[in-house]
Amino acid sequence: MVPTILLSALLLHFTDVVAAEPRYILWVSSVVQRFSSEKACLHLLNLNESVSLSVTLEYDGSSTTIFDQPVDEGNFYACADFKVSQMSSEQLAFVALLVQGNTLKISERRSVAIAAEENATFVQTDTPVHKPGDTVHFRVVTLNIWLKPVDDLYPLITVQDPQSNVIFQWINVTTFRNITQLSFQLTPEPILGDYTIVIKTQSGTTVMDHFTVNRDVLPKFEVELTAPETITIADSQFQMVTCAKYTYGQPVQGKAQIKVCRELFSPAHCESNENEICEQFTVQLKDGCASHIINTKVFQLDRSGLFMTLNVNEVVTESGTGVQMSKTHSVFITSVLGTVSFENMDPFYRRGITYFGTLKFSGPNNTPLVDKLLQLELDGKPVGNYTTDENGEARFSINTSEIFGAQISLKAVYVRPRSCHRSSWLSPEYLDAYFSASRFYSQTSSFTKIILEPKQLPCDQEKMFSVLYSLNPEAYKEASDVTFFYLVMVRGGISRSGQKQVRVQAWNGNFSFPISINADLAPSADLFVYTLHPSGEIVADNVRLQIEKCFKNKVSINFSRDKDLPGSNTSVHLQAAPDSFCALRAVDKSALLLNHGQEMTPESVYFTLPYIHQYGYFYNGLNLDDQQAEPCIPQKDLFYNGLYYTPTGNIWDGDLSNLLSNMGLKIFTNLHYRKPEVCSSQENQPLLRTFDHPNERIMMYGGGAPPSSAFHDSVDSISHAKVAIKETVRTNFPRTWIWNLVSVDSSGTANVSFLVPDTITQWEASAFCVNGNAGFGISPKVSLQISQPFFVEVTSPFSVVRSEQSDMVVTVFNYLTTCVEISVQLEASENYEASINTQRNTDSEVLQAGEQKTYVWTIIPKTLGKVNVTVVATSKQSRACPNDASKEQDVHWKDTVVKTMLVEAEGIEKEATQSFLICPKGTKASKQTLLELPSNVVEGSVRSFVTIVGDILGVAMQNLESLLQMPYGCGEQNIAQLASDVYILDYLKATDQLTEELKSKAQRLLSNGYQNHLSFKNYDGSYDVFCQSNQEGSTWLSALSFKTVEKMKEYIFIEETVPKQTLIWLVKKQKSNGCFRRDEKHVDTAQEGREGDQEDIALTAYVVGVFLEVGLNASFPALRNGLYCLEEAFSNGVTNGYTQAILAYVFALAGKEQQAKSLLSILDKSATKTNNMIYWERDEKPETDNSPSFIPSALSGETEKTCYVLLAVLSQDTQDLDYASKIVQWLAQRMNSHGGFSAMQDTTVCLLALTQYMKLTGSNPQNTITLSSEESEEVFYVNRNKRLLVQHSKVSKGHQQYTVDVEGDGCSFIQATLRYNVPLPKEASGFSLSVKTGKSNSSDEFQTKFELTVTLTYTGARESSVTVLVDVKMLSGFTPVVSSTEELKFNSQVTKTDIKNGHVLFYLENVPKEATSLTFSIEQTNHVANIQPAPVTVYSYEKGEYAFDSYNINSISDSQ
């Protein structure tokens, strides 16, 4: 066998001392940053003559000079700064080195990359969680890689809802002093979930940030559960600590109920069929906290067959109010009692330099195991025993002088005592540690090693770095001075350089040198230390320094006081670099408890920053590794001392080229720095270098309150008058308090005053600042605790029914430093009776410091409507209390809380209206009004008023958000409202009546409505009645949506793709004959023409009418083919009155006058003409409608049909306005009190018709209107300037007769409205309905939760009712359990659930003739006695079908 010898050792033996020939080294970063200062360092050694030196950076036809100077003979070292100052699209560049003398010429040219200008854009929202209807504020700031602000232009900023619909858009947004600040308003009914803010930057990158929209109520207090993350099977017990604190820092008084369970794998094997082992206990909170020791014996931790987790569920209940907050926690169980690991290990060992490392022994939760014996093995042989210190660590060192192997293998084990365990149970384990270190190559066997403590280095201090060295003395002179050099690289570029001269006595030693640590190096830097061996080798080492994430712009904010009072004045002191521009933000801590979101922190800023760590010489597709490899060593035997040796390389050895590649540092040199490579055969291909990594570079992206002491700790800083009583009224409760941009003056400070909100909470405040020179900085968070030493809280139900008795819970908090005498009074009122249920000896009592007391009053309301209940709590010094209050603290306080309670009448509400459009034409015109009440009206529930306005559309203009008296939970109601608003806006704009105030209001409504309506859009562009059903969309609804969204583009932002996508879907619904296919569902059978064979014709007419209304070109294929379908139907004969009306309108729009006139002539013959009015009735007139006023009337079809005729008359080339006015007279009588009509369909069509009519006729009234009865007389004036003014007159007896006299010219609209309650009707039409209540847990002694089951059956003429609403009113003092209502969405018929103003709404589709049951839970939150029944209503949207029932909890059954 031929012996082998390590190649490096053989080469060293055969290497003679190299002659002193000229040497050179040029250091330059492989990626050069544009517009930033870069550095290059150059060594010239052993020059035997003077030379000229030139180093240039060549790029895109230009060049930048780095060095250009003469150099004398000898040695030369210098570093030069340079900058790429020109814009260039080219990324590839070259650095050229030229050293020219008489006899010497050194020339080398290598590639580098010029980094594309990359910036980081950050988004900050005012709060991470918003509620419906909020105004959302956000900021945008862009920084370059050096944290300098960039005055960027953002081509596009959009906001996307959870379904990726763009709901807001800003184009070409500029910054103000490098910060952009925008806002938008959410609709009151938004899609709940995560919203996305999308920023398109000038460079083409996209930045996104998120916030959440939900209906969560801000938590009253927070619960912290402290328990170990992990326990071992050997632990007999562990401690669990529960703490509950109000957001303003004070402890909660109450109790904690804790349940700890361990689940079984197979519960079926248990006799009791239980699937878990549980322990439950209750602990009382003391000072807001409670500690409990959990005994683990019951959980059998070392038993197999159970999950290795303890599930902890905790509920904290506040005393007095019963408010609960829950918390969950998981405790993991492990059989691993300890883990040995290696820490701070170098991947390479250097022979001759001691190898250092750390052993760590830790238990679960990373707890250090102290005073334990660990054994270290090297290549399988023990080298020493080590005992762990108080940190569970033990330092070790290994002498490497006699180690020659390519790798060393280390193993560390815990020297454990012997033990025995049963095989069927879990056994304790200890995990060993393993590590391998490779040899580092040096041709001269010379090494350096930087010693670095493995911790983050703090900013703004000087750090001493120690370097070990072991140098081969060959080629050195005796007692030589050796010069060590260092480079510091930050974000891919050379930032600093220096040198240290060391007097070498022994060739193994160490030295130290300082480096100033500051923000320029953050968040990490590479330190590279090297020396030049006379034998022609570079001896070097590098380490990566982790730097504190600090900023050059030092920003700090402070409140004038750490704690303050609600409603007080405070100031914020801001410090930053002079002339900085700063963004302040203060958020209620309660909002952060819901979701911390992507908070802007130093960590998130640096994490997002595109700083460079180059691994390998690849950048953006460029291979910058153009260093020519040295010739490989042929695999040829060498003869030495009588033996043949075969060269063997080692692919695992580290060398300097690895270190340089890791840093992205390029070298131009003729010195030795690579390990030799053996020429390989095909079967012995060398592997890639261990540390070369072909990634372009690493780019990091991301998003990203101390418990306070008792209030009295700082109450001394709040000055109180010693005699005056402090009285507070609290009304301002925002989630975000401070959202301001502030300039810092030339001294670097700013003071800003703010009014503290009334929320008793803790505010979390911070600021970030930008400055052209100092760059970006962000402050640490500061807190301001807001509390009153003495205040009262009141809890009561939102609404009650008259004659019910409700409990009002009043809690008084005393956070003064002493006990006080308190008095709590509920003020008397003629609107209610009040009696106290809490026993007390006198009107005043003593309340100890830090405690609270609860009182309960029973309230019996006497009047209907909103009733204000006033509670007053006062405090004063008591003789029974020691006088230990702070001298500066006043104990005289008065806190007043006014609680509003809605008192409702029994039964359900009905409405009757009587309307007239009176046009006197210079004479006097009179009308009589008489609205009669039914005999069963609820006493005291009658409300009546008369409305006078000079424009028939005036009432609708005042009710743009509520034209109909019904819930807006379906897509049909939502788009009908939007369409009506657009018609009115178009009318106001056309008649020059659109004021900025009205336009602003309408735009807000349209924007909110558009957001809502996107929730009904399917992914194919169609719209459905219910949110995102993604079933077959409704053609009628999609057509109306397309038209409305197209017309809304004139007033608000609409994403272009939204209507286009709907148009594409509509076109696909067209058949080959040009007609549009009827909908399989959501068909409104209440209207004529939407039944039978002519349904396709009516639907086609509607869609074609939409195409014409939005102005599609007549050549548009779907429009042209649709008209062909309608003409064919017309020629075949149309007998249905509704279809005739809509066809007449469409033909008039299309300019087909002959067909329009023919249809109008036919319709005129079937019209009802009476009292100067014209209208059309249904062919089959239904019985008189007795349904409640909020249920769509079956007679709405007559109104819609009449309005289509009016549209047809007005759309002809020659309009008959006299004929049209008679139709309008009848329509005026059909208007409801909100300006709409009976239902959604007739409202949209009729408002379009009325706006078209008013555009043609105008509105210029000059009227005097007298409203008189036997008892009173009132006069109103209407003129051109007041034509849109809606005037009201409350009348004492709305059901008596009134006379309306109108004098003057022009028209005025007069409407009398009567509202009243009647007992729940017993009749039904189309449905049967029953409601049952049951106990949710029959074992509860004090029942607070109940199950409510609503069962409905369709009994109408059709197979099923298409769109149905179930409205369940909550009993007084009760609220629905939201999770139980949400679960009903899994019912195939329930498409949506909603909770509004004490009502639970269920939207259903296709309710069959079989019984459908809905079961959900309700919970009593406030005690109410003599509870009145609550009504439940079911009705159909398309047809006047309905049923009623009621429920109560007086008679209940246990739920099974």
Curated annotation (Swiss-Prot):
Zinc in keyword set: no
GO cellular component term of the entry, any: extracellular space
InterPro entries: A-macroglobulin_rcpt-bd, A-macroglobulin_rcpt-bd_sf, A2M/Complement_sys, A2M_N_BRD, A2M_TED, Alpha-macroglob_thiol-ester_cl, Alpha-macroglobulin_TED, Ig-like_fold
Signal peptide start-end: 1-19
Key words, A-Z: Bait region, Disulfide bond, Glycoprotein, Protease inhibitor, Secreted, Serine protease inhibitor, Signal
GO molecular function annotations of the record: serine-type endopeptidase inhibitor activity
Localisation per UniProt entry: Secreted
Stored Gene3D superfamilies: 1.50.10.20, 2.20.130.20, 2.60.120.1540, 2.60.40.1930, 2.60.40.1940, Alpha-macroglobulin, receptor-binding domain, Immunoglobulins
Residue positions with a glycan: N48, N172, N868
Family to which the UniProt record says this protein belongs: Belongs to the protease inhibitor I39 (alpha-2-macroglobulin) family.
Quaternary structure and interacting proteins, as annotated: Homotetramer; consists of two dimer pairs that are disulfide-linked. Part of a complex composed of complement component C3, CLCA1/CLCA3, A2ML1/OH and ALB/serum albumin.
Function, as annotated: Inhibits protease gelatinolytic complex activity against type 1 collagen.
This protein's name: Alpha-2-macroglobulin-like protein 1
Organism whose genome encodes this protein: Mus musculus (Mouse)
Gene designation: A2ml1
